[in-house]
Amino acid sequence: LLTRGRANTLRLALSGQLGAEGLSNPELLAAMDLCVGCKGCKRDCPTGVDMARMKIETLHHYKARHGFTLKDRLIAYLPRYARHAARWSGLLNLRNKIPQLAKLAEYVSGLSAQRSWPTWHNTHFFNQATQGVTKEAVLSAHKPVVLFVDTFNGYFESSNAQAALRVLQAAGYSVHVASKTEGGHGANKGHLCCGRTFLASGMVDKAREHAHELINTLLPFAERGIAIVGLEPSCLLTL
């Protein structure tokens, strides 16, 4: 279904032509399901139709009425449980190696056995000793920069985050890795999340909480004109 078809289906739902369920209509959800949220339609369409936002609103209303599945919650809350799950990396990674476990996981969670899970690592970016300078140091530095490390690069592809840190430091920058508690720069302070996983599951209110937390943390740096560097386009575009 093309963007125009999805938009027409949404119009039918809003006008009541798909029944009394409105935005919580299963037919509307099916029409929106294949939208990947790339925002290409908003960028390229002459009328600026933002289908990605419409999909999120549809998910929000549908899930508010029909409830969230275990699959929804596993995706949405990944940033919150990733730190704990990483400790069990050896066990969790068996799912990708044993087909029977993949099928069992699909039965329990709803996540397809035909797709591999991200590889967990017991050692990741957020529990490494070297994570840049403190907030106070970067605010007074000659060449300051703030690095926003997202959940996926922090836990699943730590080499990307480590490489970004090394490149910035090699360029002469004082790098601060933003965290929930800005009193230091240790791993236990908690990493920041843009809320993208919650949006993908229709949990708009939870996504808003994380977005506010991220913006409030980064605001002091932005007000000083300090550059904020991110690694994951989806996370940056969510802001």
Predicted regions and their residues:
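Mobile "lid/hinge" segments at catalytic clefts and subdomain interfaces of large enzymes
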Residues: 1-18
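Iron-sulfur-cluster electron-transfer modules
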Residues: 15-193, 198-239
